[in-house]
Amino acid sequence: MPTIAQLIRNKRAPKVKKTKSPALLFTYNSLHKKTTKNPSPLKSGVCTRVGTMTPKKPNSALRKYAKVRLSNGFEVLAYIPGEGHNLQEHSVVVIRGGRVKDLPGVRYHIVRGAGDASGVEKRRQQRSLYGAKRPKKEASK
């Protein structure tokens, strides 16, 4: 426990919280070639690679991911949620924060239904997460 004199001499330093999605914190000014801190919830980017990855130890699957070059110059790995996708190299996508626990290095999710990423077909529940439109009502008899 510090004494009062020690606290006067040297104040308590606030704890610095480290962000879990650092690529969303910055924007790039191409006119001045400078990166500035300007956090945003979403960022757009272009897919440079689309592929599958196997998850960590207890799980087994082929998870779809894309390597995305963001508008601020960062290059990140983003998970493609839902069943089936239409993404390929040079597709324009929007990413949000949110890691995938069993994929190392994947800290972002691609937003379905935004940019070139289409919504999930035949999705009935939790549609907003997957960019699926509301199904048309069938004619009642």
Curated annotation (Swiss-Prot):
Q: Which PROSITE patterns does the record cross-reference, listed alphabetically?
A: RIBOSOMAL_S12 (PS00055)
State the HAMAP family in the record. Ribosomal_uS12_B
Q: Could you state one GO cellular component term attached to this entry?
A: small ribosomal subunit
Q: What is this protein called?
A: Small ribosomal subunit protein uS12
Signal peptide bounds: none
Q: Which sequence positions carry the modification called 3-methylthioaspartic acid?
A: D102
The task this protein performs is described as: With S4 and S5 plays an important role in translational accuracy. Interacts with and stabilizes bases of the 16S rRNA that are involved in tRNA selection in the A site and with the mRNA backbone. Located at the interface of the 30S and 50S subunits, it traverses the body of the 30S subunit contacting proteins on the other side and probably holding the rRNA structure together. The combined cluster of proteins S8, S12 and S17 appears to hold together the shoulder and platform of the 30S subunit.
Tell me which domain of life the UniProt entry assigns to the organism this sequence originates from: Bacteria
Subunit structure of this chain's protein: Part of the 30S ribosomal subunit. Contacts proteins S8 and S17. May interact with IF1 in the 30S initiation complex.
Provide this UniProt record's keywords sorted from A to Z: Methylation, Ribonucleoprotein, Ribosomal protein, RNA-binding, rRNA-binding, tRNA-binding
The cross-references to Gene3D superfamilies, in alphabetical order and at most eight, read:
Nucleic acid-binding proteins
Extract one GO BP annotation from the record: translation
Task: Report the sequence similarity comment from the record.
Answer: Belongs to the universal ribosomal protein uS12 family.
Q: Which InterPro entries match?
A: NA-bd_OB-fold (IPR012340), Ribosomal_uS12 (IPR006032), Ribosomal_uS12_bac (IPR005679)
Q: Cross-referenced CDD domains, in alphabetical order?
A: Ribosomal_S12
Stretches the record annotates as Disordered: 115-141
One term of GO molecular function: structural constituent of ribosome
